[in-house]
Amino acid sequence: PQTSNKVAAREWKERLRWKGDLRYRHESFDVEDRRDRTRQRIRARAALIADVNENVEVGFGLATGGDDPASTNQSLGDGFSTKAIQLDLAYARWASPIDGFDVIAGKFNNPFLRIGGNGLLWDGDLNPEGLALAFERGAWFGSAVGLWLNEESRDEDSYLVGVQGGLNADLGDAVALTAGIGYFNLLDLEGRPPIFDGDPRGNTLRADGALAYGY
């Protein structure tokens, strides 16, 4: 029995993977008509990923920072106070019998391709929440999502649906082309306060402080 227990423990150990990173950053701001500012920031992330079987993967991760969905940076200072650790990942991923198709549920890494890591649509630190279907086969890729933005007990929930698809083409002589198209629709946001921290982030507000449009 002891031998079988050791074998089982070793098999489980082989199914577990750790990943993480630590970054220290010095920031300096020199803005006209404002006082110069410097600050020290850290970012620490750690995640445990387990292969439950050949088709199912689950992941759990923690990260520094507050509850800002687009940042895991933590400013140092504040009298040596302890710093917050937040839930950054909690998901299950199922590899379907259809080759190249995966289903993901929970709080997961962004499944959409960000060309050059550009943050025009999606911040690099953002881990969305909801359901996703991811596809990758040969040069072709794609994703479809249903993401929950805000849960309301007395009104319709706000959410996002989106699709993206494209292909990666190797043109030879160290030249590659990535082409794709995407569609994203934010639902039940018009007439609601800005989500998360109340900051409209450039969006138009009505006189009562609610969003004038559905984005």
Model-derived regions, located:
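Signature for the C-terminal beta-barrel architecture of outer-membrane proteins
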Residues: P97-V103, P111, N118-Y215
